[in-house]
Amino acid sequence: TILEFTMHNQVLNILLKYMVHMKTQQSFARNEGDKEIVERIQQWFDRFESALQVLLDEKSIHLEYDYKNYNFKIRQEGREPFEFSELSDGYSSVIYIVSDLILRMDKSWLLGEEISQYNAQGIVLIDELETHLHIELQKKILPFLTKFFPNIQFIVTTHSPYILNSISN
């Protein structure tokens, strides 16, 4: 629906602004000689990039920061760089879920506190997780979420046998 599309785009735009903010903070920290902050922010980006590689099932994927336009693109071997908004509905839905969780976990970082490594504890409810996901993505989504967010308990409703069979517990 139009409302879903608008919400997905809003969260994606917030995530991209957040990532630009992190790159800016990393540059300031580098200029100030704060190697610890530089490294921790780099670890955040490395982990996010690794998650994209797993999610998109493509090891050649890398994030590309366009500092002139304050934007991130996804670079894949043998393909022109593309924007997050160019992902299919299925991948966009997963990025929406991941972005929402990242932003909620990292909200404290925006307030000047510890940088999250996605290890916050909590419970997340997702209704009909299979919506917009093709079969291969349905098979990967729960293992991906539980690996990327190890301390989150996911409670999911689904009609998909692929999601149900994708995880042992």
What is the meaning of each model-derived region?
Residues H62-D66:
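Short beta-strand
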Residues N69-N169:
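Switch/communication elements of ASCE P-loop NTPase nucleotide-binding domains
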Residues I37-F48, L56-D57, N71-S85:
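Accessory N-terminal region flanking or inserted into the helicase ATPase core
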Residues T1-L55:
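Coupling/switch segment of ABC-type P-loop NTPase heads
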Residues Q53, D57-E58, P150:
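Residue-level recognition of short, structured coil/turn motifs
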